């Protein structure tokens, strides 16, 4: 939108919604492919037919992308409620047992213990009441042979490299958060480092020119809350109890970046 409005192609977090004031100071609607597909079905078959599927508060289907320790990482599935995250992973991901943890909502989403995520409904309005979100629709299963903190460190490093370079919290805050998290995972944290990491995350939250820094903070804070046993081991400088060799999440271009 910024580019189309004659400005730099960088993200922004406007105080006034684009639906009220957008390009050329006029109301602007931005839709994703899922919304457009729903509009096509509405136009073809009508509202009565459309509302027969899904929940009354959120009719229609939901697109989800499965990742991590599933049968086919990257698989996009269309689900119609009522259903749960566990049912989706069992049916489409061929996940046979409750995983240790699930990352819900994207790489800037929320880590949840597997037993918690398993029972969650795939309904955006209900998830928001439970403090979770479908976000971009990613459901990523943590491999039992991958440390959740090490996986998070990879994600934070990659996300820090994706900065648009337009504000301090992104330019300076995210690389610092990545470095601090790497130190924790490597078992080199000293007394007070965890507190400093949490304080830095708090200071970055909500301060960026867009939502990118806040999303990274959400990922970090949920990891610290979800992976308690691993966190204690790393803080003591012990070898991680999770054996190496598992399947990590795909991160385009991470290995090519310095």
Regions inferred by a protein language model and the residue ranges of each:
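Short, structural beta-strand-to-alpha-helix junction motif
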Residues: 83-87
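Secondary-structure transition/capping motifs at alpha-helix termini
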Residues: 93-98, 187-191
């Amino acid at each position: 939108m910024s580019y189309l409005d004659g400005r730099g192609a960088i993200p922004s977090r406007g105080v006034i919604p684009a639906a009220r004031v957008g390009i050329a100071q006029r109301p602007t609607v931005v839709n994703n492919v899922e919304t457009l597909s729903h509009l096509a079905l509405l136009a073809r078959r009508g509202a009565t037919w459309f509302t027969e599927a899904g929940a009354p508060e959120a009719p229609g289907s939901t697109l989800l992308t499965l990742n991590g320790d599933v049968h086919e990482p990257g698989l996009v599935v269309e689900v119609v409620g009522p259903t749960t995250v566990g049912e989706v992973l069992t049916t489409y991901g061929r996940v046979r047992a409750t995983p240790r943890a699930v990352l819900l909502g994207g790489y800037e989403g929320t880590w949840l213990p597997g037993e918690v995520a398993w029972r969650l409904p795939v309904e955006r309005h209900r998830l928001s009441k439970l403090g979770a979100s479908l976000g971009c629709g990613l459901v990523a299963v943590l491999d039992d042979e991958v440390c959740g903190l090490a996986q998070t460190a990879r994600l934070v490093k990659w996300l820090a490299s994706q900065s648009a370079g337009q504000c301090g919290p992104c330019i300076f805050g995210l690389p610092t958060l990545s470095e601090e998290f790497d130190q924790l995972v490597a078992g080199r944290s000293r007394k007070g480092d965890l507190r400093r990491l949490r304080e830095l995350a708090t200071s970055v939250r909500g301060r960026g020119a867009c939502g990118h820094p806040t999303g990274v903070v959400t990922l970090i804070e949920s990891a610290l809350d979800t992976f308690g046993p691993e966190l204690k081991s790393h803080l003591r400088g012990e070898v991680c109890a999770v054996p190496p060799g598992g399947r990590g999440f795909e991160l385009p271009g991470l290995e090519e970046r310095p």
